[in-house]
């Protein structure tokens, strides 16, 4: 990469407030012209230039990211322990993108995607471009071909751990093979997706390794390249189980934005994952609306525009699932309050 060159220059201290503002504006504009918009963050922790967003299908996550969804033209990493809900988070984005008329490719390197489950979440399997590569190199070839078209809004890669280099499959095992492949591929890919505004979600796992004096350390496969090139990294954590009597019907899931280059990081929204149905949009929207004052709560009863929605959060979910017009009105008003389109 060509390194920026600096010409010799003179400096002086500015005292006039207006001169300072103008000088700062010129400096930030110069930097963004050379290195791209969104390089500079404003006082609210948001990129100084508008970043287009691809809705995640989870409103509270859109809020946590800060711009209304995943930033377009960027790499995203979803990582967490086994069965934490990573694939479900990704599939919610697939369904939302398709609902909005977008095109999606799903790279199933693990050969484990349950199509029926994906359809339950709203994924249209008949219009989903689905691929199952044998090697990491094959996967990246497919990704690059999809990006090259400029037609895809979202590409999901499931998962990084399954992107095994061809040489390793052939029996030639050397330390750092996968990390080297990831570094080489991602360094070339990051600029291309910025041009096509494609979002690529990489699903990754947390693994425990022994380090130091037998200390247990958690890490993610694939080396450090994905951590570096991702604009947003989200850790998916399982939480409290949701029960209906003695039956466990779901669980609470925390989505922790451990890295965020388009807004402030370290947000931790908690969402409800209903087994078989995914994250409840009704509960998610109502919870967000309650925080904004769009929905009112008196005791156990929730209300919207003077109309009772139900008793308890699951009562509200039941009501809204049978009254889509009320849900759509609530969803739209909540997004307006958040200044999301």
From Swiss-Prot:
CDD domains: RecA. One of its GO terms (cellular component) is cytosol. Keywords: ATP-binding, Cytoplasm, DNA damage, DNA recombination, DNA repair, DNA-binding, Nucleotide-binding, Plasmid, SOS response. Its main location: cytoplasm. GO terms for molecular function: ATP binding; ATP hydrolysis activity; ATP-dependent DNA damage sensor activity; damaged DNA binding; single-stranded DNA binding. SMART domains: AAA (SM00382). It is found in: Cytoplasm. InterPro entries: AAA+_ATPase, DNA_recomb/repair_RecA, DNA_recomb/repair_RecA_CS, P-loop_NTPase, RecA-like_C, RecA-like_N, RecA_ATP-bd, RecA_C_sf. GO terms for biological process: DNA recombination; DNA repair; SOS response. ATP binds at residues 80-87. It comes from the Bacteria. PANTHER family: MITOCHONDRIAL DNA REPAIR PROTEIN RECA HOMOLOG-RELATED, RECA. Can catalyze the hydrolysis of ATP in the presence of single-stranded DNA, the ATP-dependent uptake of single-stranded DNA by duplex DNA, and the ATP-dependent hybridization of homologous single-stranded DNAs. It interacts with LexA causing its activation and leading to its autocatalytic cleavage. HAMAP family: RecA. Belongs to the RecA family. This is Protein RecA, plasmid. It comes from Lactococcus lactis subsp. lactis (Streptococcus lactis). The lineage of its organism: Bacteria, Bacillati, Bacillota, Bacilli, Lactobacillales.
